[in-house]
Amino acid sequence: MLKTLALISIGASCGAILRWFLGLMLNAIFLPIPLGTLAANLLGGYLIGVAVSMFNALSAVGPEFRLLIITGFLGGLTTFSTFTAEIGVLLQGQRIMTAVAAIVLHVCGSLIMMLLGMGTFALLRTCFR
């Protein structure tokens, strides 16, 4: 149990640091919608698609590695709380259309990126057989 907690914690720390770094690098580029949070969620969506597909296809991958990557790293990278807070700020500022655009970009974008990640894994798996 302690090993599992350590793996999740290490993964989550790494994911959160990457999310913070993306915010530092990207949030000032386009002020209406913080691009760092969007990039974190889209990248996380893509990587979750790859990871889920890979773990389903490769039964030799142990549950600890799944917890490290999916629960830990990708859980720390993606962020519903920051997304929600940013939408709240937009709504408080009466920027309804910007809030709606951000919601669509985050939710639909993450789902599309997840499907692209799954497709990428399927394509790579076919190419390297």
UniProtKB/Swiss-Prot annotation:
This is Fluoride-specific ion channel FluC. GO terms for biological process: cellular detoxification of fluoride. Keywords: Cell inner membrane, Cell membrane, Ion channel, Ion transport, Membrane, Metal-binding, Sodium, Transmembrane, Transmembrane helix, Transport. One of its GO terms (molecular function) is fluoride channel activity. The chain crosses the membrane at residues 20-40, 67-87, 96-116. It is a multi-pass membrane protein. Na(+) is not transported, but it plays an essential structural role and its presence is essential for fluoride channel function. GO terms for cellular component: plasma membrane. It catalyses: fluoride(in) = fluoride(out). It is found in: Cell inner membrane. Pfam families: CRCB. It comes from the Bacteria. Na(+) binds at G75, T78. Fluoride-specific ion channel. Important for reducing fluoride concentration in the cell, thus reducing its toxicity. PANTHER family: FLUORIDE EXPORT PROTEIN 1-RELATED (PTHR28259:SF1). Belongs to the fluoride channel Fluc/FEX (TC 1.A.43) family.
